[in-house]
UniProtKB/Swiss-Prot annotation:
Organism of provenance: Cronobacter sakazakii (strain ATCC BAA-894) (Enterobacter sakazakii)
Pfam families, A to Z: CorA (PF01544)
Gene giving rise to this polypeptide: zntB
Superkingdom of this protein's organism: Bacteria
Source lineage: Bacteria, Pseudomonadati, Pseudomonadota, Gammaproteobacteria, Enterobacterales
Record key words, sorted: Cell inner membrane, Cell membrane, Ion transport, Membrane, Transmembrane, Transmembrane helix, Transport, Zinc
Protein name (database record): Zinc transport protein ZntB
Catalytic reactions on record: Zn(2+)(out) + H(+)(out) = Zn(2+)(in) + H(+)(in)
C-alpha cells in the first residue's frame, strides 16, 4: 500500500494524532510525516467535533461505507472486512456498578496496515492504558499489536466490572441468609446490568474469535494467539454473567418468599391478639350496653372485681393458646 502524508490525516481537533515509532513509543503527527507499514498512524477522533466530522465525511483514505459507520449510530460489536482494511465496532465499560449501563460506550475502528482510525463520542477509559504504555515507550509497535492491546484493555475493564457485580451478589446473598432484604430496585438494577453486559459482550467475544482466525496481513501468529486468549477470557466472563443472572433469579424468589413469610407472621400475630382480647371485648361491650344498669355498679368493689376477671380471662385464653401450641 502507498504511503500517506501526515497532512492528509492531521485533523486539528483530533483527540489523538500520533505516529507509532515501531519501538513501543509514539511521536506527534507532523504534516511532513510519512505514514507507512513501519510507521503507522493512530488517529483518535470524537465524531461530535466539527472538524473531525468533516474529515470523516470528506477524506478519500476511507471507503464510503466506513465513513458512515465511523460516525453513525451505535451498533452491537461486529467486524467487517472492506478491501485492504477492516471495520470493527466494540463496546467498553466506563461506569461503576451503581450506574445503569443501558448503553455501553461504543468505539469504532478502521484499521489497515498503515492507519488506525478510532472514533467515539464518550471517552473510552480503556484506551488510557494504551496511551500510558505508548507514552512510556512500552506500547504496541505496529497496527496488530495496537488492536490486541486495545481488545485486552477492553476485556480487562469488562472483567473487573463483572467481578464487582459478582461481589455485590455475594453480599446480597449473605444479607438474605440473615433475612436482610435489599432496598427496592437494587436487585432490578443488578439484573439490568448483567443482561446488558450479556447482550453486548457475547457478540464482542465472537468479534475477538474472528479476529484471531482471520489472516490479516497486519497481524502475526503471536497476535492471533493473544487475541484467541482474550476471546477465551471474555468467554469465561460470559459464563460468570450467566451464573450471576441465575443467582439473581434465585434471590428474587428468596426475597419474595421472605416478604411473604414476614407478612404471614404479622397477620398471624394480629390474629392471636384478636383471639386474646375478643372475650374481654365482648364482656366490656355487654356491660357497657347499660340497658338495665351496670351489674355491680352500686358495689364499691365492682369495678376492681371486673378488672381482675378480665385479667384472669385474658390469662386463661393465653394459656389455652400456648397449650394448643398456637403461641
Amino acid at each position: 500500500m502507498e504511503a500517506i502524508k501526515g497532512s492528509e490525516v492531521n485533523v486539528p481537533d483530533a483527540v489523538i494524532a500520533w505516529l507509532l515509532d515501531g519501538h513501543g513509543g509514539v511521536k506527534p503527527l507532523q504534516d511532513d510525516a510519512v505514514i507507512d507499514k513501519d510507521h503507522p498512524c493512530w488517529l483518535h477522533l470524537n465524531y461530535a467535533n466539527p472538524e473531525s466530522a468533516q474529515w470523516l465525511t470528506e477524506t478519500p483514505l476511507l471507503p464510503n461505507l466506513v465513513r458512515d459507520a465511523l460516525a453513525g449510530e451505535s451498533l452491537r460489536p461486529r467486524v467487517t472486512r472492506m478491501g485492504d482494511g477492516t471495520l470493527i465496532t466494540l463496546r467498553c465499560i466506563n461506569g461503576s456498578t451503581d450506574e445503569r449501563p443501558d448503553q455501553l460506550v461504543a468505539m469504532r475502528l478502521y484499521i489497515d496496515e498503515r492507519l488506525i482510525v478510532s472514533t467515539r463520542q464518550r471517552k473510552v477509559l480503556a484506551l488510557d492504558d494504551i496511551i500510558h504504555d505508548l507514552n512510556e515507550g512500552s506500547g504496541p509497535a505496529d497496527v496488530g499489536g495496537w488492536l490486541v492491546d486495545a481488545c485486552d484493555a477492553l476485556t480487562d475493564h469488562a472483567s473487573e466490572f463483572i467481578e464487582e457485580l459478582h461481589d455485590k451478589i455475594i453480599d446480597l446473598e449473605d444479607n438474605l441468609l440473615e433475612e436482610i432484604v435489599p432496598p427496592r430496585g437494587v436487585l432490578a438494577l443488578l439484573r439490568k446490568q448483567l443482561i446488558v453486559m450479556r447482550r453486548y459482550m457475547s457478540p464482542q467475544r465472537d468479534v475477538f474469535s474472528r479476529l484471531a482466525s482471520e489472516r490479516f496481513s497486519w497481524m502475526t501468529d503471536d497476535h492471533r494467539r493473544r487475541m484467541q486468549d482474550i476471546a477465551d477470557r471474555l468467554g469465561r466472563g460470559l459464563d460468570e454473567i450467566d451464573a450471576c443472572i441465575a443467582r439473581t433469579a434465585v434471590m428474587a424468589d428468596e426475597i419474595s418468599q421472605t416478604m411473604q413469610e414476614s407478612l404471614s407472621r404479622r397477620s398471624y400475630t394480629m390474629s392471636l391478639m384478636a383471639m386474646v382480647f375478643l372475650p374481654s371485648t365482648f364482656l366490656t361491650g355487654l356491660f357497657g350496653v347499660n340497658l338495665g344498669g351496670i351489674p355491680g355498679g352500686g358495689w364499691h368493689l365492682g369495678f376492681s372485681v371486673f378488672c381482675v376477671a378480665l385479667v384472669l380471662l385474658i390469662g386463661g385464653v393465653t394459656w389455652w393458646l400456648h397449650r394448643s401450641k398456637w403461641l
